[in-house]
Amino acid sequence: MVAKKTTVNEMGLSIDPLQQTEVSFKIIGTAPLIYNSMSLKAQKTLLMGAAKKTAAEKKEIKHNPEEEFVDSCYINGNNGSYLSFPSTGIKRGMATAALETAGVTKASINRGIYVVGEHINVWGKPYMNMSVVRSSDINRTPDIRTRAKLPNWCTEVTVRYINPTFSQLDITALLVNAGTLCGLGDWRIEKGGPMGGYRIVQTKDDQKIFDRLVKEEGATCQKLALENPEIEAHDNMSHELYEAITQERLKRAAIIKEVA
């Protein structure tokens, strides 16, 4: 057993510094990941307030699906990825999973572990998803939101934890449970949805899936997908909504041309 290092301060008190250990995990999604970043436009509105719309602006189509699709993403990736996700999503999931994991508490997870990096890299091709959502106002006003959806995705996380308060087995169990009980992104399992689930890469087949996504659905693929949005073939609602807004754009363009 390695002896603990003891620090003696000026008052003669001995303090045993906490020992930290890091462990890295490769993760693959078991359900699609839906992005939920707040757009820069929305952030500016919060900062400066919404300007009163002109008569011309009131006549504009309410939503711009292509713009909202891109704005929903976190674009801070590196090491071969373009997309990313806040690392706090992983930690929050682990803390929530602690409620269903014997021997640990949510408070101890919040204090004793740290997911390295502000963002984690995400590999996977984003598709445009349009769906009905409910606003958080008192009336739960319905609206259409366009977001990036990754049917297949993977990431890699490094967790730093206090040792011996936690063991590598504890961290592994928490991450496994977080992927099962919580997930990442919008409409995730924790919030009653079916999205965002994940598991740790543990088998050769899992490793093949991870390697393929990193190789084929990295930065180049992701940039092209954001520049040229596609909708999944089976996503009938998104196809119908996008067709409706496309026809409305053509109709308005024709009216403007006639007036000119």
List PLM regions with ranges.
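RNA-interacting cores
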Residues: 1-260
